[in-house]
Each structure stands twice: as C-alpha cells, then as structure tokens.
Regions:
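Alpha-helical transmembrane segments in inner-membrane proteins
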Residues: 1-345
Length: 345
C-alpha cells in the first residue's frame, strides 16, 4: 500500500473519531464538550439527564449510523462490481423493496384487519417491524439467488431485480389503498429511514451481526478483483463465474437486508461512497477499495446523522432526505472532475 493511500486511510479513520465525538456533543440539547468527555471517560459527576442522553440516545444512534454506513457502502461496491454498472447500489435487486413490502404487510394490515396499530405497541412494534423487514428482504434475496443460477447474463438478472422492486412497490400501493390513515402515516415514517430506532439489546444484536458479516465480505476481495477483468478472463484464471456471482450477491443482499431491517431503507450511501473512494484513491483494486468504502461509508453516515439531528433545534430531519442532499453533490462533483481530467488528457 502506497504512503499516500495509507495517509488517506488514516485521515478518514481520524475523521470518524472526530465525527463520533461530535455526534455525542451536538444535538437538540446542548451539552458542554468537557461534560461529554467526562461522561464517556466515567470521571466526575455530570447531571443524570445528560448521562442518559449520551448513553441511551446519542451513542447508540452514532454507532448505528457508523455500522449501517459501512455495511451499505460495502454492499454498494459489491453490486457495482458484480454488475459492472456505476448506477448499481444496495437496493438495485429489489431487496430493500422486499423489506418495505414485509413491513407494509405488518403495518398497513394491522389496523385494517381489526388488530392493534403497531404505532401503539412501542418497543414490541419496533421488533415486529425488524422481523418483518428481515423476512421480506431475505425472501426477495432467496428469489434473486435462485434466478441467478438460471440466467447467464448480469443484465438479465439486473432487469429481473428491478422488476421485483416494481412488483413490491405495486403491492405496497394496494395495501396503502385499503389501509387506515394512522397505519399509512406509521409506514411512511418508517420509510424515511432513521438511525435512532436501534437501542439497547437491539443495538447490540445489530452491531454483533454486522461485525460478523462485514469481515466475511472481505473474503471476496480476490473474487471481486477477478470479476473486474470480465467473465472470459476471470474464467480462464479459474474463477467459477456463477458461484462467484452467487457469493457476492448473497453478501451484498444480506448486508442490505440487515441494515434495512433495523434502520429502514437508507438511500444513496451505497451508491455514492464507492464513487467517492475510487476518485480519492485513484484505483479499482478492492484490496484498497474495501477498507476505504468501509471507513468512508461510516464517516459519511455520521455526517448525515449529525445534519439530520440539526443541532440546536427540536426534532430531526429524515435521514433519507439528508443522505440524498449530501450524496448527490458528491457524485456530481466526482463525475465532473473525472470528465475534466479526461478532457485535459
């Protein structure tokens, strides 16, 4: 690894540490920097209210953003590589739509069928949503994996994934039509995405699952580098194309499914971060890109979480709105600078 690459990687890691601390300091309730430091280090006696805000609200939210951002960025890189498509992202195969459909069945039918609206169940309702999202997303992923063994071309698989997404959205539209207003509102709020839903035991489980999945995705680095060469060259070098595609899609799909289950559908991070890292590190080598997108995804998610909380104001902006507002200019600037460099050459 070149010295410049190492320096950039360390710079991103340092920015994560700074952003983590800023996420603990800034918010609707103003807590002095020194007080946050004392709370984190366990020294001094700070107000119990401040301790609860840091430990029970801001820290879980920051950790969730960090882990979710890293997972989505890795998933996006894998999808862009396997499909050789710069517009591919974690949601391209309809896995996020599958999660949304699973949640829609639970949320939109709970009141319509005479049951209790999930919005009234609090924590139990959140668990039900997570389970529904996992079932929905993994069901779609199982279908995609099955189809991937039946078709040869990546383009065909990509089109099928997009069609599955359209079908899922159509089913959601029908469910909305027959649902009561309260359930529709609860579903829309879930669909906006949030890093604040995960806390306590849920957060520990989420972090533990992602701590297993993310290192496993690094085992596919050599496979991803071979896939960059094209199917013909990769096959000549001994790569089983169908098996490799199955492993990469499964890895990306499970990462997306788990993040969506706990945080809702988070857009743009998985699409923007790989482009940003390719531009910064000037390489397509996944030995560099995989750790780069992991750290950059975590950092960008922390930035979005910080903006969404709007320090000094009550309430929070929808995370999806912030990720789009932050991610779109990033991609645009990268593409324009790349085009400018090509013209200069």
């Amino acid at each position: 690894m070149r010295h410049s690459t190492t320096f950039l990687m360390l710079l991103i890691v340092a920015s994560i540490l700074v952003l983590m601390f800023l996420n603990l300091v800034l918010g609707s309730v103003s807590i002095p920097l020194k007080s946050v430091w004392n709370i984190v280090c366990g020294i001094g006696e700070e107000p119990v209210t401040w301790q609860n805000i840091v430990w029970k609200s801001r820290l879980p939210q920051a950790l969730t953003a960090l882990v979710a951002g890293a997972g989505l960025a890795i998933s996006g890189l894998q999808m862009q590589t396997v499909f050789r498509n710069p517009l591919a992202g974690p949601s391209v195969l309809g896995i996020s739509s599958g999660a949304s459909m699973g949640v829609a069945f639970v949320v939109l039918l709970s009141g319509s069928l005479g049951g209790v609206a999930l919005s009234k169940l609090g924590f139990k309702g959140e668990i039900a949503l997570s389970i529904a999202a996992v079932i929905g997303s993994l069901s779609v992923m199982a279908l995609i994996v099955y189809v991937s063994q039946k078709v040869k071309g990546n383009v065909t698989l990509l089109i099928i994934g997009v069609m599955i997404g359209y079908v899922a959205n159509a089913v959601i539209g029908v469910l909305k039509f027959f649902s009561v207003e309260e359930d529709i509102r609860a579903y829309v709020i879930w669909g906006l995405g949030s890093f604040s839903r995960v806390s306590g035991n849920q957060m520990m489980l989420f972090v533990a699952i992602m701590a297993i999945l993310i290192p496993l995705s690094f085992l596919l680095i050599k496979t991803l580098n071979l896939m960059l060469l094209g199917d013909g060259y990769a096959r000549n070098l001994g790569l089983n194309i169908k098996r490799a595609r199955l492993l990469v899609i499964t890895s990306a799909g499970v990462l997306t499914a788990i993040v969506t289950a706990y945080c809702g559908p988070i857009i743009f991070l998985g699409l923007a971060v790989p482009h940003l890292c390719r531009a910064i590190f000037q390489t397509s080598d996944h030995r560099i890109l995989m750790p780069a997108v992991l750290f950059a995804g975590a950092a960008l998610a922390l930035v979005c979480n910080l903006i969404a909380r709007m320090p000094g104001f009550e309430g929070a902006l929808p995370v999806n709105s912030v990720t789009a507002l932050v991610g779109a200019p990033v991609i645009a600037s990268v593409l324009f600078s790349k085009r400018k460099n090509e013209l200069n050459e």
